[in-house]
């Protein structure tokens, strides 16, 4: 007999609505158990979905998706949503090749109203949907679900300001668990914590309700006017000042209260915000105790069987973490900045050793970059540790605030290139292209851990904006040497061959070496995308017939394009054959990195096929 007696009856939200409300609590427990059992096989984002279980059940119980729009922010918390919307049997394939996405994806399900993976987008998208439906005569409801981490992003406030200003009928649910991935920081987070802590208003409100319940007519009246009397007890609510009808905070794990509240708010027109308090990792003791560790789990995390051994080689993030701690010990001007990615960027040790020189600015990439500019103006040496996919959110600041003024800022760009299971929303496919066109920048692409370490050092000492991009995961195990012969804009010949030259940008050097063995090709580790080693390019063009460029970045506008531009400017394009190999002009689905590289023709077999046609 199945242990999922209620869940087995549910494949769609229509099935969910047939379940008696009295059984929703049991269903929530079954959903958590199913999530544990499934992710123990597949792995995936875990703690966030545990924390949003009752909220997800209540939303699909009250609202009529997909006619009603439920828009999720970031998407880490949507596994329960996927289970309830026809993907229960596919959950075991999540983030696998050919399986379902780890995030909401419009092409995957009509219930996924808006594709997501980055934060702070839900309110803007939901507002657009609400207005579009209204203009087309639809009577649908629109809900945006956003966490207390994501709501610190500036875009969320822009959308709140717009929605409140035009009085659009939209519900924003603030899922407040006091923790996104890393601990939340900033004034707004402190504001939420103060509300949760049980201040005077919440105390008197609950005690007053107990008394007034004995006088039903007055109790009902007070409930209706409650929001109008808040000012008697507390300062004007932040969200009400933005034009929202504010309700909360309420218990996000009381499914009965959630259903009741959502039904009331469904009939209340205009902008409203429901503030729910949840616990990340709810229902799984270890995840409740350490939600950061259990934010994402590997297969067998629960059963303990076939536990993957730890990676013996350090990751590129570890290399950065070591470098910044060592450099900070030598240079008191160094300050480290991250937009809410302390763990991912390996800044934990730095934050502990140098708390007054460590700044987690929350999910605020634009602010992170300009903040770094301000620090640089006053003589400090800021290092911005940021994922490639998030750097693109601060593009204007990179150009206008840093490059234009030639400020001394080092970008340590993590997760450059393909990231694998997280898919297109998290791939670092574009940074070389969008950074290369900006004046005053130095751009470096290390081929191994040792180059990464010394390029960070070089970029730090360089007087002006500099960027070092490195991939997710471990490298080849290169030893960190005491020094490295590194000169601005100078490449290194790794292997001398003939006829074919392979210009490598980044960590595809092992691939270049494999090709060189097969074709007796010259291999050059270019090291710098900007400035290019033009002397080396001149030499190669004079001594070789075919030139290949390799990069884990989009071909359009990338490092290979820079090589092409140089050869065209020198009138060499008709004298040599140049082929660029990099990421194709399309968004890739999730899968293993090796598979995605092969799909991008970045493997020996595919490149050999192209070479054989040219020889």
UniProtKB/Swiss-Prot annotation:
Example of a GO MF term: magnesium ion binding
InterPro entries membership: Dxylulose-5-P_synthase, THDP-binding, Transketo_C/PFOR_II, Transketolase-like_Pyr-bd, Transketolase_BS, Transketolase_C, Transketolase_CS
Record's catalysed reaction(s): D-glyceraldehyde 3-phosphate + pyruvate + H(+) = 1-deoxy-D-xylulose 5-phosphate + CO2
Gene3D superfamilies named in the record: 3.40.50.920, 3.40.50.970
UniProt keyword Kinase, yes or no: no
Pathway: Metabolic intermediate biosynthesis; 1-deoxy-D-xylulose 5-phosphate biosynthesis; 1-deoxy-D-xylulose 5-phosphate from D-glyceraldehyde 3-phosphate and pyruvate: step 1/1
Binding site for Mg(2+): 148, 177
EC numbers: 2.2.1.7
GO cellular component labels: cytosol
Cofactor: Mg(2+); thiamine diphosphate
UniProt remark on cofactor binding: Binds 1 Mg(2+) ion per subunit.
Annotated thiamine diphosphate binding sites: 76, 117-119, 149-150, 177, 284, 365
Keyword Glycosyltransferase: no
Signal sequence annotation: none
A single GO BP: isopentenyl diphosphate biosynthetic process, methylerythritol 4-phosphate pathway
Keyword field: Isoprene biosynthesis, Magnesium, Metal-binding, Thiamine biosynthesis, Thiamine pyrophosphate, Transferase
Family to which this protein belongs: Belongs to the transketolase family. DXPS subfamily.
Role: Catalyzes the acyloin condensation reaction between C atoms 2 and 3 of pyruvate and glyceraldehyde 3-phosphate to yield 1-deoxy-D-xylulose-5-phosphate (DXP).
The protein's assembly and partners: Homodimer.
Protein name per UniProt: 1-deoxy-D-xylulose-5-phosphate synthase
Annotated gene: dxs
């Amino acid at each position: 007999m199945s242990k999922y007696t209620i869940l087995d009856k549910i494949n769609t939200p229509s099935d969910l609505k047939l379940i008696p409300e009295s059984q929703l609590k049991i269903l929530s427990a079954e959903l958590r158990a199913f999530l544990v059992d499934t992710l123990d096989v597949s792995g995936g984002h875990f703690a966030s979905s545990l924390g949003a279980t009752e909220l997800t059940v209540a939303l699909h119980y009250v609202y009529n998706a997909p006619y009603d729009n439920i828009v999720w922010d970031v998407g880490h918390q949507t596994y329960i949503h996927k289970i309830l919307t026809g993907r229960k049997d596919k959950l075991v394939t999540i983030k696998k090749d050919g399986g379902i996405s780890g995030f909401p994806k419009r092409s995957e399900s009509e219930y996924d109203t808006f594709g997501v993976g980055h934060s702070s987008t839900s309110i803007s998208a939901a507002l657009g949907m609400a207005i579009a439906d209204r203009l087309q005569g639809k009577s649908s409801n629109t809900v945006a679900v956003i966490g207390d981490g994501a709501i610190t992003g500036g875009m969320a406030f822009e959308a709140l300001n717009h929605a409140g200003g035009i009085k659009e009928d939209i519900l924003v649910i603030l899922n407040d668990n006091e923790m996104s991935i890393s601990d939340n920081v900033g004034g707004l987070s402190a504001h939420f914590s103060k509300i949760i802590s049980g201040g005077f208003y919440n105390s008197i409100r609950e005690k007053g309700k107990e008394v007034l319940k004995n006088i039903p007519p007055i109790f009902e009246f007070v409930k209706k006017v409650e929001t109008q009397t808040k000012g008697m007890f507390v300062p004007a609510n932040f969200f009400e000042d933005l034009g929202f009808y504010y309700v909360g905070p309420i218990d996000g794990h009381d499914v009965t209260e959630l259903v009741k509240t959502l039904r009331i708010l469904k009939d209340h027109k205009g902008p409203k915000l429901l503030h729910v308090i949840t616990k990340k990792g709810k229902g799984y003791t270890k995840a409740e105790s350490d939600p950061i560790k259990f934010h994402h789990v590997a297969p067998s995390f629960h059963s303990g069987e076939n536990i993957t051994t730890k990676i013996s080689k350090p990751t590129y993030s570890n290399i950065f973490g070591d470098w910044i701690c060592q450099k900070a010990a030598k240079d008191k001007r160094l300050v480290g900045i991250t937009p809410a990615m302390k763990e991912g960027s390996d800044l934990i040790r730095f934050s502990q050793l140098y708390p007054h020189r460590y700044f987690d600015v929350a999910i605020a990439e634009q602010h992170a970059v300009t903040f770094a500019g301000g620090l640089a103006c006053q003589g400090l040496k800021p290092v911005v540790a940021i994922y490639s996919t998030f750097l693109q959110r601060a593009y204007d600041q990179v150009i206008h605030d840093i490059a234009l003024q030639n400020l001394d800022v080092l970008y340590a760009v993590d997760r450059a290139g393909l990231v694998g299971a997280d898919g297109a929303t998290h791939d670092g496919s574009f940074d070389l292209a969008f950074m290369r066109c900006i004046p005053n920048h130095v751009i470096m692409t290390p081929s191994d851990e040792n180059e990464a370490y010394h390029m960070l050092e070089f970029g730090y000492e360089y007087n002006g904006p500099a960027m070092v991009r490195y991939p997710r995961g471990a490298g080849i195990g290169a030893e960190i040497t005491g020094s490295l012969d590194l000169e601005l804009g100078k490449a290194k010949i790794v292997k001398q061959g003939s006829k074919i030259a392979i210009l490598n940008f980044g960590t595809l050097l092992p691939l270049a070496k494999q090709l060189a063995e097969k074709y007796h090709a010259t291999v050059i580790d270019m090291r710098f995308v900007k400035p290019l080693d033009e002397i080396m390019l001149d030499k190669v063009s004079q001594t070789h017939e075919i030139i290949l460029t390799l990069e884990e970045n989009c071909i359009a506008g990338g490092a290979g394009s820079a090589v092409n531009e140089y050869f065209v400017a020198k009138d060499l394009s008709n004298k040599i054959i140049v082929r660029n190999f990099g990421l194709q002009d399309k968004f890739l689905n999730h899968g293993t990195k090796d598979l995605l590289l092969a799909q991008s023709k970045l493997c020996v077999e595919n490149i050999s096929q192209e070479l054989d046609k040219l020889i």
